[in-house]
């Protein structure tokens, strides 16, 4: 990572440059804003460490101009004259951190490493989105929330391997879409993607569906039939709701995954098969293993790489963009939701996740009385949830305050000094309110 240090004190520049260079970073230095702009315009700088109070342009002024040149650049502001108001100003301008001198180098290194991880995730998300632009996937994957950005980053890494993948997620979270994405980004993307909904297969037909049968293998087998494993040869096989596979058939599935060979029902010939398995479920697979409803050895065979998709209620930042996508997809005329309706949609918990949101938008478009969809046009359960969550004025204010505190703490990595500065309150007040609302870092 390329880091630019901007400080008018040569001793501070040299100290930071020497320390960071020893950690393996590519470090550039500037004594003032003009030097910083010259370097920034010619070098791919990813992090700028700025002194807040310098001769000429201040750190805030330099930061504002650098952000105008590249909004994606990360920045730390350092100062010997720290106070809440200056910290708030810098953070609002886009600084990631506000650090006081003398700088604790170990803390600085931790924060830089955290930024590195963020940059890697952002680059992988950008790469995935670029790939989706040229894909035939039916829906763009919305990932503004940190949770979904992590999902796309992990999926991108998984795609580069050949191991089996297990996707966990509630109904309607997009497990099928993620399976398609992993296949699309993999080396098998020019081969087939076979999707099997295990929940839709009658128990007595599972073996035939998965492995095929020979003519005359059983009553009604009038001709030879190739199963999904055979059809997926060379590509990816996606077994959705894999927990529905009968316990009696699981040993054969395990054997095929281990030996990469199988025979059709009624056949003697062993057929070689080369597939990448992606399995998914909305159930607690570990609990099923403990209850004896799913084989433990098969559990470990399919769970080499695991990916969990967060429910929509944990990625509310994505809801407005998802709504726009569904409006563009299903509406034949310009139409939008009122602010009140949009607020209700963002707050609703969505037990059916993205699929439920999609159906809500489809219904709203169908019954729209004009170009504006209002709260009264939404389903009763959403209006009821909005009404029951409004509460008294005091309850509303407390809910808003708690949400603001939690947002500031999460944005500041639970560093209380930075969170307090972001909110414009003292650390003592922040600690009091954290106790009041029982806010704790559980990660």
Which residue stretches match the model-derived regions?
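Bacterial C-terminal helix-turn-helix
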Residues: 2, 14, 391-443
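Two-component/phosphorelay signaling modules centered on CheY-like receiver
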Residues: 10-28
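The feature encodes the CheY-like receiver
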Residues: 13, 55-56, 83, 245
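Acidic catalytic/metal-coordinating carboxylates
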Residues: 32-35, 58-61
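Active-site beta3 strand of CheY-like receiver
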Residues: 43-49
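Nucleotide-binding/hydrolysis machinery
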Residues: 106, 110-114, 120, 186-191, ...
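AAA+ ATPase active-site-proximal loops
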Residues: 129-272, 277-283, 288, 328-367
């Amino acid at each position: 990572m390329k880091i630019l240090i901007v400080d008018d004190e040569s001793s501070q520049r040299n100290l930071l440059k020497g320390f960071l260079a020893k950690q393996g970073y590519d470090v550039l230095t500037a004594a003032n804003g003009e030097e910083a702009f010259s370097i920034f315009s010619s070098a791919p700088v990813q992090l700028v460490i700025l002194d807040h109070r310098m001769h000429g342009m201040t750190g805030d002024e330099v930061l504002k101009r650098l952000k105008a040149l590249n909004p994606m650049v990360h920045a730390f502001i350092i100062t010997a004259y720290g106070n809440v108001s200056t910290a708030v100003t810098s953070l609002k301008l886009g600084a990631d951190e506000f650090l006081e001198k003398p700088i604790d180098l170990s803390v600085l290194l931790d924060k830089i490493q955290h930024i590195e991880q963020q940059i890697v995730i952002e680059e992988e998300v950008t790469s995935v989105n670029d790939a989706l632009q040229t894909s035939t996937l039916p829906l763009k994957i919305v990932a503004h929330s940190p949770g979904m950005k992590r999902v796309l980053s992990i999926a991108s890494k998984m795609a580069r391997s050949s191991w089996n993948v297990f996707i966990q997620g509630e109904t309607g979270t997009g497990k099928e879409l993620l399976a398609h994405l992993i296949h699309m980004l993999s080396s098998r993307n020019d081969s087939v993607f076979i999707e099997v909904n295990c929940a839709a297969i009658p128990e007595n037909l599972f073996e035939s569906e998965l492995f095929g049968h020979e003519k005359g293998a059983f009553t009604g087998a009038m001709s030879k039939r190739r199963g999904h494993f055979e059809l997926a040869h060379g590509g990816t096989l996606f077994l959705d709701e894999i927990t529905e596979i009968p316990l009696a058939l699981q040993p054969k599935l395990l054997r095929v995954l281990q030996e990469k060979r199988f025979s059709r029902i009624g056949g003697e010939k062993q057929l070689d098969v080369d597939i990448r398995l992606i399995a998914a479920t909305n159930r607690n697979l570990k609990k099923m293993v403990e209850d004896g409803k799913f084989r433990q050895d098969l559990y470990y065979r399919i769970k080499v790489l695991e990916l969990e998709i967060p429910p929509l209620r944990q990625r509310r930042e994505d809801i407005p963009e998802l709504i726009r996508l569904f409006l563009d997809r299903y509406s034949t005329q310009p139409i939008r939701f009122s602010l009140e309706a949009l607020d209700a949609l963002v707050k609703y918990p969505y037990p059916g996740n993205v699929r439920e949101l999609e159906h809500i938008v489809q219904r709203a478009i169908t019954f729209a009385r004009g170009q504006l969809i209002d709260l009264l046009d939404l389903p009763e359960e959403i209006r009821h949830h909005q009404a029951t969550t409004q509460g008294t004025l005091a309850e509303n204010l407390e809910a808003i305050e708690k949400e603001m505190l939690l947002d500031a703490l999460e944005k500041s990595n639970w560093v209380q000094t930075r969170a307090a500065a972001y909110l414009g309150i003292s650390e003592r007040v922040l600690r009091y309110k954290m106790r009041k609302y029982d806010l704790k870092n559980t990660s």
